[in-house]
Amino acid sequence: MLRDTQIFTLIEKEYQRQNEGLELIASENFVSQQIMEAAGSILTNKYAEGLPGRRYYGGCEIVDEIETLAIERAKSLFHASWANVQPHSGSQANAAVMFAVLEPGDKILGFNLAHGGHLTHGSPVNFSGQLYESHFYGVQPETGLIDWEEVGTIAEQVNPKLIICGASAYSRDWDYKRLRAIADQVGALLLADISHPAGLISRGLLNDPVPYCHFITTTTHKTLRGPRGGMILMGADFENPFGKKTTKGKLKSMSTLLDASVFPGIQGGPLEHIIAAKAIAFQEAMSDDYFNYILQVQKNTRQLAQSFVKRGYNIVSGGTDNHLILIDLRNKGITGKLAEEALIKASITLNKNMVPFDDQSPLITSGIRIGTPAVTTRGMQETDMEQIAAWIDDVLKNHENESKIDSIRKEIGNYMLQFPLP
């Protein structure tokens, strides 16, 4: 069989792009060689519909062992009692939970996408906003912070069946204990989508949702530094509150409903090569090396925020607790779109992002989102964050000066030589 030189040439170009540039997209990271090896292994050949020990195909004895390892490691890492590691993505993990606990038209209460939430938390362009009656809470215009009392007030007014917490562009920690009290007060179930801060949560650097939330979903990439995929966790299993029973008349456990919602509900065969890579990522995340890494992510992000504040930039919420910052560029007279386009010319990759109460469209935006997981994986520390802020500031001040931007691009390329990819 002929080698597909066209595709492999493009892969090599992408390698060069990643190797020579500054990767500051908050949802991206660089996985280890052993994770890539597992993801590209012969496990991609195997079909394994069902769960370990209960498959619809033969020859699953070995993948059963692999998936069981992934499940047990996920439970150990997050101190959970139950896990399903089959979701292909965070969005599918969220869909599986919603399909398990909601009926079309049920009310959900999520964090406003325009304030830093996620599409799958009720956005009208997403299944979550099309199948369910979506309501939202957001941040305060004065502080950029979530007002938990207001969340409680909205919940009482809306009376949702499911409350969703979690974000894609919120730089602060979450009060899961307070949210559980709100959920209990209105009789709602509580879902925490920790896709972004999962790595920090797993090692105790942020509040833990597992003791308080009925369901926890996450991606396995981002701060967890694993392969692209999703996962569902529960701190404790419980009988479903909907009266759904087994053929013997016993109430089904919530884990049974969730498993069935993943398969056959929304997926067919699981990706066992990716599940193997997830298992490796979970083991890596329990190591001392990973703890030092994720602690450095938090330190780097705080330093980066300070470096931008020093240069007159407006950090939404005034700072950061996690792995990202959201910068409101309106006082700099440049849109998020223009900033993103100028920075990519300098080999600095990040994304334009809506800021709370934005007066620009989602395709233009007034802000940029910056994350440190990928550059921290490459070995960068606080002093490097100061340099990154200086480069970004320089590009934005000279966004129409092509020669200046090209000079910065070359400087960055040379600088990155000391920080090899894993």
From Swiss-Prot:
List of residues binding (6S)-5,6,7,8-tetrahydrofolate: 113, 117-119
Source organism (scientific name): Amoebophilus asiaticus (strain 5a2)
EC number: 2.1.2.1
Task performed by this protein: Catalyzes the reversible interconversion of serine and glycine with tetrahydrofolate (THF) serving as the one-carbon carrier. This reaction serves as the major source of one-carbon groups required for the biosynthesis of purines, thymidylate, methionine, and other important biomolecules. Also exhibits THF-independent aldolase activity toward beta-hydroxyamino acids, producing glycine and aldehydes, via a retro-aldol mechanism.
Self-association state and partner proteins as the record states: Homodimer.
Site-annotated residues for Plays an important role in substrate specificity: 221
Lineage, uppermost ranks: Bacteria, Pseudomonadati, Bacteroidota, Cytophagia, Cytophagales
Ranges that cross the membrane: none
Protein's recorded name: Serine hydroxymethyltransferase
